[in-house]
C-alpha cells in the first residue's frame, strides 16, 4: 500500500512569527528604497543646479543675472542670444562649423591611427614590441604642457599656425595613447584562433585586421568616437594656442572672445552662447550613451 511522503504541516507556533515579520520587513525595505531614491534625486538636483542656473540666466536680462539669483526668472528675454550671435564680425554658426570640422577630423584620425597601432602592439610579433608599448603608456602620464612648446615651434616653422592642421594632424599620428591602450586591451580579448584560421586561408596581416579584428572592435571604436568628440569639442588650451584669427575660431575660443568683448555686462550673453554650445554635446551623448556604457563594459576599462 502506498504511503504519503508529504512533509507534515508546520506548527502554528512556527509560522506566526514569520507571518508577523513579513510586513515589517517589507515596510523596512520600502522605507530604505524611498530614502535612497530621495537621496539620489537631491544629489542629481545638486549636480544639475549649475546647468539649470545657466539655462535660466540665458533668458534673463543681463542686469538681472547676478543681482537676481533665483531659479524662477521674473523677466524673460531673447536679447542675450541676439547680442551674442555675432563675435568678431562672424556669426556663431561659423564657430560651430569650425568645431565640427576639428571634432570629426579628430575622430577619423584617432579611429584610423589608434586602431592600427593597437593591432600592431597586440597581434604582430616584432622586436622590442613590449618596449614600444611601454613608451606608449608613459606618454599617457606626460602632461600636454610639456610638449606644447616644441609642437608649437615645429608647426610655426612650417607656417601652419592659425590653421586646423596642428589640431588634426597629431590625431592621425596616434598621439592619444589612452585610446591605444583601450584598443590593445580589447584586441587581446579576441581569440587568436580567428587570426590563425584567416592566415591558413591566405590572409595577410592587413586582411586579418580589416576583415576580422576591425569588425569585432566596434565597442572600442564607439567608445573612442564618443570620448574624442567630447574632448575635442571642449578643448580650449590647444585651440587657444594655435588659433588667432576670428575666422578659424572654434566654439570655446569664441566664448572666450565673447567674455573679453562683453566683460562689462555680457554675463547673460555668455550664458546664452554657452547654452547653445552644449546642445551638440547633449544630443550626441543622448544618442550614444547606450553604446558608451556597452563599450566601457566590454573593453579594458571593465
Task: Give names to the regions the model predicted.
Residues 2-29:
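Short, Lys/Arg-rich, polar N-terminal cytosolic tail immediately upstream
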Residues 32-302:
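A structural signal for multi-pass alpha-helical bundles of membrane permease subunits
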Amino acid at each position: 500500500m502506498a504511503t504519503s511522503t508529504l512533509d507534515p504541516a508546520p506548527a502554528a507556533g512556527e509560522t506566526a512569527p514569520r507571518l508577523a515579520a513579513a510586513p515589517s520587513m517589507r515596510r523596512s525595505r520600502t522605507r530604505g528604497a524611498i530614502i535612497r531614491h530621495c537621496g539620489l534625486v537631491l544629489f542629481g538636483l545638486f549636480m544639475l543646479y549649475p546647468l539649470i542656473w545657466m539655462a535660466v540666466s540665458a533668458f534673463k536680462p543681463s542686469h538681472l543675472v547676478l543681482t537676481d539669483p533665483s531659479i524662477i526668472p521674473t523677466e524673460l528675454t531673447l536679447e542675450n542670444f541676439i547680442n551674442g550671435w555675432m563675435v568678431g564680425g562672424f556669426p556663431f554658426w561659423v564657430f560651430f562649423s569650425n568645431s565640427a570640422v576639428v571634432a570629426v577630423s579628430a575622430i577619423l584620425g584617432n579611429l584610423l591611427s589608434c586602431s592600427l597601432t593597437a593591432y600592431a602592439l597586440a597581434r604582430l610579433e616584432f622586436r622590442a614590441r613590449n618596449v614600444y608599448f611601454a613608451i606608449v603608456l608613459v606618454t599617457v602620464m606626460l602632461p600636454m604642457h610639456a610638449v606644447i612648446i616644441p609642437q608649437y615651434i615645429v608647426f610655426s616653422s612650417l607656417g601652419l599656425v592659425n590653421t586646423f592642421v596642428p589640431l588634426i594632424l597629431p590625431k592621425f599620428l596616434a598621439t592619444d595613447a589612452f585610446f591605444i591602450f583601450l584598443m590593445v586591451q580589447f584586441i587581446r580579448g579576441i581569440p587568436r584562433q580567428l587570426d590563425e584560421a584567416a592566415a591558413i586561408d591566405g590572409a595577410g596581416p592587413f586582411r586579418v585586421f580589416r576583415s576580422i579584428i576591425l569588425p569585432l572592435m566596434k565597442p572600442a571604436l564607439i567608445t573612442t568616437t564618443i570620448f574624442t568628440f567630447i574632448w575635442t569639442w571642449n578643448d580650449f588650451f590647444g585651440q587657444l594656442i594655435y588659433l588667432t584669427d576670428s575666422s578659424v575660431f572654434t566654439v570655446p575660443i569664441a566664448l572666450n572672445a565673447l567674455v573679453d568683448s562683453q566683460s562689462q555686462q555680457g554675463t547673460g550673453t555668455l550664458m546664452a552662447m554657452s547654452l547653445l554650445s552644449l546642445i551638440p554635446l547633449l544630443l550626441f551623448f543622448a544618442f550614444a550613451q547606450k553604446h558608451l556604457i556597452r563599450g566601457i563594459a566590454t573593453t579594458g576599462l571593465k
